[in-house]
UniProtKB/Swiss-Prot annotation:
S-S bridge residues: none
Protein's recorded name: Histidinol-phosphate aminotransferase
Gene: hisC
Organism name: Thermotoga neapolitana (strain ATCC 49049 / DSM 4359 / NBRC 107923 / NS-E)
Pathway: Amino-acid biosynthesis; L-histidine biosynthesis; L-histidine from 5-phospho-alpha-D-ribose 1-diphosphate: step 7/9
Residue numbers bearing the N6-(pyridoxal phosphate)lysine modification: 202
Amino acid sequence: MNPVDLIIKRAYPYETEKRDRIYLALNENPFPFPKELTEEVFRKLEGDKMRIYYDSPDEELIEKILEYLDADFLRENNVSIGNGADEIIYVMMLMFERAVFFPPTYSCYRIFAKAVGAKYLEIPLTKYLKIPEVDVGEGDVVFIPNPNNPTGHVFEREEIEKILKKGAFVALDEAYYEFHGESYIDLLKEYENLAIIRTFSKAFSLAAQRIGYVISSEKFIDAYNRVRLPFNVSYVSQTFAKVALEHIDIFKERIEYIVSERERMKKALKELNYSISDSRGNFVFIFMDRKEQNKLIEQLRQKNIAVRSFREGVRITIGKREENETILKELEVFR
C-alpha cells in the first residue's frame, strides 16, 4: 500500500471544535495569561534573537525550571523541553519498541502511536480504576497520567513502582500536577527507567505557546535530545515560560481558585446523585453510559456548552464560577 494511504488508513487526526460557546472540553485554564506579564515578555524580546536558530532549551529556562522543581538531586542535564508535552510523548513513541497505556487515559497516546506506526498495547484500568497486571519489560514505555486524564484520580505510588521494578520505562505524565500538588518526582532518585512529563499549558495559561518539559536521568535526557527536533521550542515560547516562572505567586492564586471550584463542583454533583471520580485535575468526571451521555451532550449543545465525552463518562473542565454555575444548573435539570 502507498505509504500516504497507509497513514490515512491507520491514523486519525486530532479534531477540535469552534469556540463560539462555553467551552469546557479541553481542560484549558479559564484565566488568560496576565496582560502585565505579556507586556513584560514583549519588553524582553530582542529582534536579533528572533533571526537566529535559538537554543532549545536555553540555559536560563532550565535554571528556572530547576528552581521551580526545588529538588536538590536534579541538575541541568536532568531536564529538557518539548513543543508542548505532546511532542515529548510523540518522541518517546519513536524511542521505544512498544507503548503501553491503560484506558480511560489520555487519547493522544493512542493517536500518536498509530500516527508513527508504533506497536502499542492497551489494557483497561480495573473497575476500581487501578493499574491492571501487565507483562512489560525493557523495550516498553508505559504512559501513566497522574492525576489521570480523563478521570482525574491519582494512582498509588506502589502501582507505579510495581511497573518500574519490571524494567519497563515509565513516562509519568504530570500535566495536572499543580492542581494536585503532589508528585512522585523523588522516585527519580531510585529509578533510571522513569521520566516525569510536565507542561506550561494548564496551570500557566500557555497552551497556545506549546511548551512542556521532561525530567529524567542524564542518560535518558541525552537520548531524548538526540531524537527530538533541534530548535524545537521557539524563543518567544521560552521567554513566556521564563516570565511565568518569575511570577509563580500569580499562578498559585489562580490554581487555588480552580481547585476550590473543582471541590465545590464535586460536592454539588454528589448532592445531585451523580457518580463521579475523585478528580485532582482541573476538571470533574461523571461516570455515565453512552445513552445518557448523548442526551446530556445534546441538552448542553442547545445551551451552547461543550464538554468532552468518553466511553466511560463525561469530563467537564473547571471554568470560572459563572460558567460552572451554568453547567451545574443544566446538570440539575438533566437529573
